[in-house]
């Protein structure tokens, strides 16, 4: 009796406006993966398509084109924290389901408003905290050396996103400049994606697992189902959504998933980290001298834009 070959799953790290890296990575994936496996693959983009790099607009054009170019693939586009903030600036986030206003998200962090230079232009009254931070202008430079980042301009390094659409940083003209197809893409991004049967090579051999893909990760000490519900419901009443923005709190695998054969795959952290079933695929972090990486399952092979595959 023939066993069915496991489906190829490709998880792509944070792109951050780097269209040239994305083009090269995609070509390398096509070159390295058997054609039949590539053409039917599940491709999960782990979020953060915008900011830092110069070509956010072209990156989103590329992503939008994939379903037509590769109709037998399945494409999943996770929202990263940068994309969340971008969408909020454009007025695309769902309203808080508890009936509160977005201004309620400002209160806990109001002492940082002047220091971080939150956006105060047209429409700010109805923006989520993260969107005001995204479009603002920092009064001073912040050295987040733990993340290898020296922020200039917006705390999100968002100036390049504005400029890719032909408008200056912090301008409300961005709302009109972003095409409707891009707004639809940003609206439809999912905050979490689950698969019930994904194969991965482990010390025990080929193992069938569940998979949860979320931009930053799941809080290791909080109830998993409550977190998944928040993400499925797109709860925008929260100022900082840890599964999209967290660092140490979402680095590992939640304790309750330890013995449940569940892969948790993320980007966000500016590192490539593979520890059992915890996969963090963000080797590049959006910076010029670092690669854009993807992981291919079940083999766990890492493919980068910098790889040179001979034909």
Swiss-Prot record:
Can you quote a single GO CC term? cytosol
Q: What is its EC number?
A: 3.1.3.48
The Swiss-Prot or TrEMBL record describes its family as follows:
Belongs to the PPP phosphatase family.
Cofactor binding summary note: Binds 2 divalent metal cations per subunit.
Asked whether the keyword Cytoplasm is assigned, the reply is yes
* Cofactor(s) essential for the protein: a divalent metal cation
Chain positions recorded as a divalent metal cation 2 binding sites: 48, 81, 215, 268
**Keyword set for this entry?**
Cytoplasm, Hydrolase, Metal-binding, Protein phosphatase
Q: What protein name applies here?
A: Tyrosine-protein phosphatase At3g09960
The record lists a divalent metal cation 1 as bound by 14, 16, 48
